[in-house]
From Swiss-Prot:
Function: Catalyzes the formation of N(7)-methylguanine at position 46 (m7G46) in tRNA.
EC number: 2.1.1.33
Gene3D superfamilies tied to this protein: Vaccinia Virus protein VP39 (3.40.50.150)
Coiled coil: none
Lineage summary: Eukaryota, Fungi, Dikarya, Ascomycota, Pezizomycotina
Protein name according to UniProt: tRNA (guanine-N(7)-)-methyltransferase
Organism: Aspergillus clavatus (strain ATCC 1007 / CBS 513.65 / DSM 816 / NCTC 3887 / NRRL 1 / QM 1276 / 107)
Length: 339
């Protein structure tokens, strides 16, 4: 039997060793991206072996957000799995290596954020990265709480809660809103990365299977594959059909964020949201459901800053001194039915 290529074997050995270290819990290491290499793109029209729920009410989120699982065991969904205390409301479509998820986690600590990625190895990296960051935060929290053998541990429980809150407040003030380029954090951050996760999914096919009507408050589409060839435009993640699905899942007042370094793709986005160059009747439905957010509002939105600076593609564009084109659209209230 022919052995696997040397590079692939090395990657497999690294992942096994990394899993052993994680199980040991004596040392917490962040995963190395070089051991999770994969092709830059995946064909969304291929029949990938994907697991997806029958409906949003069948989706099992409990394994993704264990800190938010409803403590009442009888509260289960249609699939019989435990419900969460709150719904997922922020989605990063095509999350890549998870830079935006990591950046948004401390910025939106009370919101559950999920990344959707179709590539297997990339998803494995993001999952390992999130688990490592959670373990780091747990270790920092444990070191911040006095041990039971110390004199301080004999004080009332109320004092413990006040001390922990003071520690977290100081950490929040001292730490930046997002980690550095390596993803390492040396202090506690709001939410402790318990509010982020990633799933493997084909958004073009199964987006409505995961999210109910008006469930989402934010959707991010960061540096999507531009598919330059005209015959590939049907694979673009922004289209009339997909925009209708995004509008279905977004609640009124919710925001859809887009950013790209390709100017032609930026104009494609504007056309498909009825902002420029479209026929009056072509995108009539879209213009009834979305309106573009002004540049003045975007300057005050921290999510736009994170979207530009925290993603891996955004950092690469900055290094190459390229341009970043941002467009954000607000979901309007549903139009009234004609009498």
């Amino acid at each position: 039997m022919t052995p696997p290529p040397a590079k692939r074997q090395k990657r497999n050995e690294y992942r096994k060793a990394n899993t052993a270290v994680a199980d040991d819990a004596s040392e917490i290491r962040l995963p190395q991206k070089k051991f999770y290499r994969q092709r830059a793109h995946a064909n969304p029209f291929s029949d990938h072996q994907l697991n997806y729920p029958l409906s949003p009410a069948h989706m099992d989120w409990s394994s993704h957000y264990p800190a938010f699982v409803d403590p009442e065991p009888s509260h289960t969904n249609l699939a019989g799995t435990r419900k969460l205390l709150k719904d997922v409301e922020v989605v990063d479509i095509g999350c890549g290596f998870g830079g935006l998820l990591i950046g948004l986690a401390p910025l939106l600590p009370e919101s559950l954020i999920v990344g959707m990625e179709i590539r297997v190895s990339v998803l494995e990296y993001v999952t390992a990265r999130i688990q490592a960051l959670r373990s780091q935060q747990q270790k920092l929290r444990s070191s911040a709480i006095p041990s039971e053998s110390s004199p301080a541990a004999q004080q009332p429980q109320q004092h413990h809660q006040q001390q922990l809150q003071a520690t977290e407040t100081a950490a929040d003030a001292a730490s930046p809103s997002s980690p550095d380029a390596t993803g390492e954090t040396l202090s506690l951050v709001p939410g402790n990365y318990q509010n982020i996760s990633a799933i493997r999914s084909n958004t073009m096919k199964f987006f409505p299977n995961f999210f109910a009507r008006h469930q989402l408050s934010k959707i991010f589409i960061c540096f999507p594959d531009p598919h330059f060839k005209a015959r590939k435009h049907k694979a673009r993640i922004i289209s009339e059909t997909l925009n209708a699905e995004y509008a279905y899942a977004l609640r009124p007042g919710g925001l859809l964020y887009t950013i790209t370094d390709v100017e032609e793709y930026h104009h494609w986005v504007l056309r498909h949201f009825g902002e420029e160059g479209a026929d009056a009747g072509q995108n009539a439905g879209v213009t009834e459901l979305f309106e573009r957010v002004s540049d003045e509002e975007l300057e005050k939105d921290d999510c736009v800053r994170v979207m530009k600076e925290a993603t891996e593609e955004g950092k690469k564009v900055t290094r190459n001194k390229g341009n970043k084109y941002v467009a954000v659209f607000r979901r309007k209230a549903d139009p009234e039915w004609p009498a």
